[in-house]
Structure formats: structure tokens, C-alpha cells
């Protein structure tokens, strides 16, 4: 990328909204009583993704698991198709491999920059062309429509590590990775998720349009298009197009996202808040284009970078900053360095380089 373009993108940092916590005078006593997850957040329009420390699981045995056999069978078949796709990769044309990488990155951004940082957390704002791109990319990813994805994710933050958390990591690696999609939702997930304020997404026509036409959209964008393009445009075999460009690519995107829910809640350091389960996991960040700095993200869910370090192993932040340089993204929320360091000192596990 040309140096002047990098300079333009870097200078666009000055347009971010810096979030600080400046208690002084009589306010100091008030701040002591404010839950840590609320102290630094100044977003008046979004509170549904902030952890609720008052919520506790009800005592008693958990409900019996109800398996969703349709999901189990489809998930097994998909992963078998993905494994077969790995075997076929050496026989693929170079264009097919490059197209698969492009489709992976685009659909991943539909989750990370779209469903996650834009629509779940409102960490930045996007103009219509960017929102259209992200809604298409999100449909390519096929991980439920934006509305449902954001509702589950807000519940995950607000009721993290409880039965109201859709992919509660306290129930083990397999459950938080994929098992939660193979069983009926816990009653607490339905109850608490149904009470979340989703009015911001209900008011967004593009999100509701995607929700209304999601099934035909996902069939076209996730399965039909990535199969037909290599087959028709450069003469790839239909089998390679189907199993590599479609099944393998889709399987990889799914598992990269799921690792944020599983591995990044079980393995890694907790430099920002040792009292929560989410961890910093560099390997997860590599696959999930920047989503592995999870202890930071759960500590500061309102930071558009989902990380203290902006572009470091964080392609999603680089993408958002490029969009800002083009005038398509704006009002990016960024936690101040002073606030981050203060939080590290208060609740970190001592693993941060500043400790």
C-alpha cells in the first residue's frame, strides 16, 4: 500500500471518539460504587452489551439437554465435506484458492466488522455503501442474520458465563465451540435474550431486510455463488468448486468464529480483568481477523478496535480504518491509554507489559 495512503489512514485516528473516565472531587466516591464494566463507557445509546454482575444462575440441576438432530446431522456432513475439501486443495487451480481466501476474508469481515463491532456493539458508525457491503458479507458467512447474531452476542456479554449466555464457556470447550448450536437453547437464554432492547436494529431497514430474505440470501451468497464462480469463470471442476470454495471455506470461517467463544474464553492471559473468563489469544486473533484479544474486548466492549493495539494482528481494525479514510466509517470509539492502564492496575492479572 502506498505510503501516503497509510499516512492518511493513520491520520484518520484523530477522528475517533476517545473514551475516558475522569473522576474528580465529589465524583470519586460515586465512581467507587459504579460496576467496573460501566465505569469507562460513555455511550448513551448502547447499554445492552454491558455485563450485569447482579445476574446469577438459579440454584438446582440444569435442564436436560434436548438434541437438535437436524443440526447435528448437517454439521457432521458439512465438516466431512470440509475435510474432503482439504484433500482436493492440491488439485485446485490457483484462482480457486485465491477466490476461496477472498471469500473467507470477506465473509469474516461480515461477522467481525459488521455483526460484531458495528451492529452488536455500535463501536463505530458506517455510511450506507459500507453497511450494504457488510450486510452482503455477513450473509456470505451464514452465521444467522445480523439481528439474531447481535441479540445472542449482547446476551453473551450481559450474562457472560451463566446459563443465559448462549455459549457459556463454563459448560466446556465443546459446548461453547459448537455444542450450543446442536441443542435447544437453555430457558434462561430465551428469557433474558427476549428482554434485551433491540430497538436500534429493528429501526434499521437494511438489517430487517436481510432478516426478511435471509434464507434465499444465504443459499445464494454462501453456497451457490462460491460454487458457480470458479466452475464457470475459470473452468474449475464442479467437485473442487463445491468442496473447496464452498464447504471447506465455510467450515473454516465457522470454526474461526467459534474459537472466539471457546478457546478465547479458556486459554490465554487476562491482563485487563482477571475476574472474567475471556482471555487474550493470539492464535484465535490470526484466524478470526482480530477477534482474539478477548479479555480486552469483554473489559471494553465499546472499543471499535476490540484491542489495545489497533492494527496488531487485527485486520478488522485495519479495514475499518481504511473505510474511515474513504469517509465510509466514522465516530470510532477508542478507549484512552490512561483508562486502559488504570484498569490494568486495578483488575489485571499482572501479565501486561506495563505491569
From Swiss-Prot:
<keyword id="KW-0472">Membrane</keyword>
<keyword id="KW-0225">Disease variant</keyword>
<feature type="transmembrane region" description="Helical">
    <location>
        <begin position="94"/>
        <end position="114"/>
    </location>
</feature>
<dbReference type="Pfam" id="PF00487">
    <property type="entry name" value="FA_desaturase"/>
</dbReference>
<dbReference type="GO" id="GO:0070542">
    <property type="term" value="P:response to fatty acid"/>
</dbReference>
<comment type="function">
    <text>Stearoyl-CoA desaturase that utilizes O(2) and electrons from reduced cytochrome b5 to introduce the first double bond into saturated fatty acyl-CoA substrates. Catalyzes the insertion of a cis double bond at the Delta-9 position into fatty acyl-CoA substrates including palmitoyl-CoA and stearoyl-CoA. Gives rise to a mixture of 16:1 and 18:1 unsaturated fatty acids. Plays an important role in lipid biosynthesis. Plays an important role in regulating the expression of genes that are involved in lipogenesis and in regulating mitochondrial fatty acid oxidation.</text>
</comment>
<feature type="topological domain" description="Cytoplasmic">
    <location>
        <begin position="1"/>
        <end position="68"/>
    </location>
</feature>
<feature type="binding site">
    <location>
        <position position="116"/>
    </location>
    <ligand>
        <name>Fe cation 1</name>
    </ligand>
</feature>
<dbReference type="GO" id="GO:0042632">
    <property type="term" value="P:cholesterol homeostasis"/>
</dbReference>
<feature type="binding site">
    <location>
        <position position="152"/>
    </location>
    <ligand>
        <name>substrate</name>
    </ligand>
</feature>
<dbReference type="GO" id="GO:0050872">
    <property type="term" value="P:white fat cell differentiation"/>
</dbReference>
<dbReference type="GO" id="GO:0005506">
    <property type="term" value="F:iron ion binding"/>
</dbReference>
<keyword id="KW-0408">Iron</keyword>
<comment type="similarity">
    <text>Belongs to the fatty acid desaturase type 1 family.</text>
</comment>
<feature type="binding site">
    <location>
        <position position="265"/>
    </location>
    <ligand>
        <name>Fe cation 2</name>
    </ligand>
</feature>
<keyword id="KW-0479">Metal-binding</keyword>
<dbReference type="GO" id="GO:0050873">
    <property type="term" value="P:brown fat cell differentiation"/>
</dbReference>
<dbReference type="GO" id="GO:0050830">
    <property type="term" value="P:defense response to Gram-positive bacterium"/>
</dbReference>
<dbReference type="GO" id="GO:0009617">
    <property type="term" value="P:response to bacterium"/>
</dbReference>
<feature type="transmembrane region" description="Helical">
    <location>
        <begin position="69"/>
        <end position="89"/>
    </location>
</feature>
<feature type="short sequence motif" description="Histidine box-2">
    <location>
        <begin position="153"/>
        <end position="157"/>
    </location>
</feature>
<dbReference type="GO" id="GO:1903966">
    <property type="term" value="P:monounsaturated fatty acid biosynthetic process"/>
</dbReference>
<feature type="binding site">
    <location>
        <position position="71"/>
    </location>
    <ligand>
        <name>substrate</name>
    </ligand>
</feature>
<dbReference type="GO" id="GO:1903699">
    <property type="term" value="P:tarsal gland development"/>
</dbReference>
<feature type="binding site">
    <location>
        <position position="184"/>
    </location>
    <ligand>
        <name>substrate</name>
    </ligand>
</feature>
<dbReference type="GO" id="GO:0006641">
    <property type="term" value="P:triglyceride metabolic process"/>
</dbReference>
<feature type="region of interest" description="Disordered">
    <location>
        <begin position="9"/>
        <end position="33"/>
    </location>
</feature>
<feature type="binding site">
    <location>
        <position position="294"/>
    </location>
    <ligand>
        <name>Fe cation 2</name>
    </ligand>
</feature>
<keyword id="KW-0492">Microsome</keyword>
<feature type="binding site">
    <location>
        <position position="298"/>
    </location>
    <ligand>
        <name>Fe cation 2</name>
    </ligand>
</feature>
<protein>
    <recommendedName>
        <fullName>Acyl-CoA desaturase 1</fullName>
        <ecNumber>1.14.19.1</ecNumber>
    </recommendedName>
</protein>
<keyword id="KW-1133">Transmembrane helix</keyword>
<dbReference type="GO" id="GO:0007584">
    <property type="term" value="P:response to nutrient"/>
</dbReference>
<feature type="binding site">
    <location>
        <position position="297"/>
    </location>
    <ligand>
        <name>Fe cation 1</name>
    </ligand>
</feature>
<dbReference type="GO" id="GO:0120162">
    <property type="term" value="P:positive regulation of cold-induced thermogenesis"/>
</dbReference>
<feature type="transmembrane region" description="Helical">
    <location>
        <begin position="238"/>
        <end position="259"/>
    </location>
</feature>
<feature type="binding site">
    <location>
        <position position="258"/>
    </location>
    <ligand>
        <name>substrate</name>
    </ligand>
</feature>
<dbReference type="GO" id="GO:0006633">
    <property type="term" value="P:fatty acid biosynthetic process"/>
</dbReference>
<keyword id="KW-0275">Fatty acid biosynthesis</keyword>
<keyword id="KW-0560">Oxidoreductase</keyword>
<feature type="binding site">
    <location>
        <position position="153"/>
    </location>
    <ligand>
        <name>Fe cation 1</name>
    </ligand>
</feature>
<feature type="short sequence motif" description="Histidine box-3">
    <location>
        <begin position="294"/>
        <end position="298"/>
    </location>
</feature>
